[in-house]
């Protein structure tokens, strides 16, 4: 009987739930008395516990990076193309860890969870978070796993922000920091996109100020529109043009035809929004986008990014994509310039791609694969 999964996949994986009773002091002054983290791991931790790789997920990501949850599972983890045997993050060499961040909606403690103080879902009362709060929970997970130092901390987009925060706040606990399609802070335009998405959610009559679960409803329409807005910014004009152009899904422009015309891109966006609203939580979306907005790596260093990076002692890989206008290459070059001014070891790659911000997730990009693989092969275990 043939194997149910591709040979270069990690195959069947089972998430693990870790419970923490130690109170977590948050950056906003509030705290969580206890919390849970949903985690997946791939590969084997070596005897020295020196081959650990932490992957930090982005806005809509989760702990499910690679592999399948059942033999009938048709959709692998979100980074399946880059994590597994013989892939850039090679599970034959590395012990790979990813957790669903707190505030998430894939098993870790978040707005959908029951608040032990009330016995009801947290909803709107769940505290807003900062990137450093996620890093603190990741540190505690590393301690639980017995990993004193990661071989590398890796992340794309919001995940890259977490990786950089690791490098500054826990410099002795990672040897390499891989930052893909990210930035040291958001531009005004980026914040504007996030606020527009939040307004779409909050304008849904089923939002109920974030306490929709208490009303036994969900703001699916608002979340769907928010996802449509976000998804447009993750693509590129060239990429959308090549994939959809002005092709029609229905109707025509023939004279005398008054049927409503639907473009392929319209149908695609509605599908993306609808499917996302079935699996993601609106409060989590608001929380995650605010964490993005609030992040500023150099804020505590008087805006001097080089001074901030002087706190780091690891080596860096920074990657950008030419068509990414949400986290444009110049934002990655700002990171590289600051690292060089701080006299830190950095490799930079700018990849030609039509896939926009989502390029860091997209398979079959040879130069990206080669750069990523070459760097990770240098990571000592």
UniProtKB/Swiss-Prot annotation:
Domain of life: Bacteria
Signal peptide: none
Reaction catalyzed: L-homoserine + succinyl-CoA = O-succinyl-L-homoserine + CoA
Main location as per UniProt: cytoplasm
EC number, UniProt record: 2.3.1.46
GO cellular component: cytoplasm
Pathway: Amino-acid biosynthesis; L-methionine biosynthesis via de novo pathway; O-succinyl-L-homoserine from L-homoserine: step 1/1
Keywords of the record: Acyltransferase, Amino-acid biosynthesis, Cytoplasm, Methionine biosynthesis, Transferase
Keyword Cytoplasm: yes
Binding positions (substrate): 227, 358
Family (UniProt): Belongs to the AB hydrolase superfamily. MetX family.
Protein's UniProt name: Homoserine O-succinyltransferase
Protein source organism: Saccharophagus degradans (strain 2-40 / ATCC 43961 / DSM 17024)
Gene expressing this chain: metXS
